[in-house]
Amino acid sequence: MTDAVWNERRLGEDKQRRNDHRSPYQRDRARILHSAAFRRLQAKTQVLGVGMNDFYRTRLTHSLEVSQIGTGICAQLKQKQPQHNPLLDSMSLIESLCLAHDIGHPPFGHGGEVALNYMMRKHGGFEGNGQTFRILTRLEPYTEHFGMNLCRRTLLGILKYPAPYTNLCVGTPEESVDDFRQLKPSKWPPVKGIFDDDREILDWVLAPLSQQDRAKFLSSHVVKDIKHKRTRFKSLDCSIMELADDIAYAVHDLEDAIVMGIVSEQQWHTDVSLPLSQSNDPWLKNEFATISQRLFSAKHHLRKDAIGTLVNGFVTAIAITEVDGFEEPLLRYNAALEPAFHEALSILKQFVYKYVIRKPEIQMLEYKGQQIVMELFEAFISDPERLLPLNTQERWLAHERLGENSHRVIADYISGMTDGFAARLHQHLFSAKSHSMMDFNSDF
């Protein structure tokens, strides 16, 4: 398929700007970087709660690091496999995807996501990646109705789970809980896909594909111990972004945890160093002993050097592989880690999950955020024309008039909030101590 088709935008543009020689993907990158949705990431939870420590990473700093790693992957792939350079011609495209990948995540991380998914259980569900697609294509007010109006290839690249909700949802929703405080996240896992409300935009993104490619790309399968079906494929650009995200999550969130004293050297030795000392890869086997020493060093520069060495190890272990059965080159090729490094990254991610994410103090913050989000949603849906800010009321009324999913408007409003704004609004609504007016139409 020609570049021209993948460079198309849903809304035709004829911007006559003086001496503007930027590529389509440089424009996409600028739109993302200057958006309100991107700015709000500075006050949204990454792993450690906002306010726990001045050192922690927010979703904004995480996204910047993912972008840096993503362009690093792209650069080394160009050198390692120059025959694929025509497909990897734009660093700005990869930057755009990495900067935008978390834009749809709600306040309070996974707690907020589970809360919104529960409140939307009869109205198409909620999931952060689906909301990212929705912000980019509908909600961000760069245009009136087309979001940021990004290129088709950029939207293809943001699709981590390229299938609609109804194709992936398994079974009927669980019984509602009697009290929000009883809600268990394990009972309400989000369906990872595109909301049915945005299905026609997904169709537009995939329009250049052959019928065979489209059917294969949209296919899904059952994964052991996961309630809902999962998609099986992603584009080349998305595979690079996802690897960069995984590396940043495993390595940089580990750094936060070490600095803040959340994990110990003994835990690291038992769960990471020992398993990797058995690796068949000589780099992993030889380097990890010195990496471990430097990671837990009291000297900041030694720890930073260890983090840099880890990131470099993963980035240089990535190659482009062929995916059977696709005609479109953007789908036929994916970036993938060498098996030994894939296993090493899985071990690191499991370590962060076990000792950081599942830590009771972190789970308490998630639980608190979960309650805040559900109670805000309950309040707004009880009387939208009374409690929603005026611009959101207008959207809600328009959806009601057209017979569209008005619950989605409330999910859009709450998911766009920062952690701090949601907490203040909750206090304003439910605490007797709150007496001041709030500016509901502010940019959170």
Curated annotation (Swiss-Prot):
Alphabetic keyword roster: Hydrolase
- From the UniProt record, give one GO term of the biological process aspect: dGTP catabolic process
Enumerate the Gene3D superfamilies for this protein.
Answer: Hypothetical protein af1432
Query: TM segments?
Result: none
Start and end residues of each HD domain: 59-250
- InterPro entries linked to this entry: dGTPase, dGTPase-like, dNTPase_2, HD/PDEase_dom, HD_domain, PHydrolase_assoc_dom
Mind listing the GO molecular function terms for this protein? dGTPase activity
Database matches in PROSITE patterns: HD (PS51831)
Segments of this protein annotated with the region Disordered: 1-28
Which SMART domains would you find in this protein's record?
HDc
- Tell me the disulfide pairings in this chain: none
Q: Which SUPFAM superfamilies match?
A: HD-domain/PDEase-like (SSF109604)
In this record, what's one Pfam family? HD_assoc
Alphabetical list of PANTHER family matching this protein: DEOXYGUANOSINETRIPHOSPHATE TRIPHOSPHOHYDROLASE-LIKE PROTEIN 2, DEOXYNUCLEOSIDE TRIPHOSPHATE TRIPHOSPHOHYDROLASE
What family does the Swiss-Prot or TrEMBL record give for this protein? Belongs to the dGTPase family. Type 2 subfamily.
Under the heading NCBIfam families, the entry gives:
antiphage_dGTPase (NF041026), dGTP_triPase (TIGR01353), PRK05318.1 (NF003701)
* Name of the featured protein: Deoxyguanosinetriphosphate triphosphohydrolase-like protein
